[in-house]
């Protein structure tokens, strides 16, 4: 079976009750509808993938190369494009150009991997960014409480090693959370209720894919 995936929008978090009346924290994801605009094959492209398009956009805002691609696929222009990698044998049999994908491709109780862009935190110090302990709060410490301390030797090695954890921009990274449980699929509203937290801000773009390290339940 081909790996399944869909683009969607994170709508926020809420809580629901399961069959045992226990509270379950869930993230609400508006999944799709997506449309297949291109199928990559090993013979032509060197790998197998399916290209998904999602979100409304004015045709005036789409450049000519993408307009031609949408026209060839016979679909209206969309705001977002993303590729879902597949096994070599899956692309031609499971998907067709112009096919529409909705939240119903997933089932209650299945496991998914969710990819999104984490919230940007701006310029952050080492205590917030890397969890450094910091320095003394008293006993003669003067204005060094949140400083990182030494970042390297002087004469030897006379440089700062690459990868040294220092202050800098934090967040706004591509993050994937693995093996999240789909608590419920609301096919009528095109919504997935995913147990736990999902990367990114409310209103952010996410990709929901069937879990790669866990088989279908």
UniProtKB/Swiss-Prot annotation:
Top-rank taxon: Bacteria
GO molecular function: rRNA binding; structural constituent of ribosome
Annotated Gene3D superfamilies: 3.30.160.810, Translation factors
Annotated keywords: Ribonucleoprotein, Ribosomal protein, RNA-binding, rRNA-binding
Gene Ontology terms describing biological process: translation
InterPro entries with a match to the protein in the record: Ribosomal_uL3 (IPR000597), Ribosomal_uL3_bac/org-type (IPR019927), Ribosomal_uL3_CS (IPR019926), Transl_B-barrel_sf (IPR009000)
Entry GO terms, CC: cytosolic large ribosomal subunit
Stated role: One of the primary rRNA binding proteins, it binds directly near the 3'-end of the 23S rRNA, where it nucleates assembly of the 50S subunit.
Subunit architecture: Part of the 50S ribosomal subunit. Forms a cluster with proteins L14 and L19.
Family, similarity comment: Belongs to the universal ribosomal protein uL3 family.
PANTHER family tied to this protein: 50S RIBOSOMAL PROTEIN L3, LARGE RIBOSOMAL SUBUNIT PROTEIN UL3C
Entry-linked HAMAP family: Ribosomal_uL3_B (MF_01325_B)
Name of the molecule in the record: Large ribosomal subunit protein uL3
The species this protein was found in: Mycobacterium tuberculosis (strain ATCC 25177 / H37Ra)
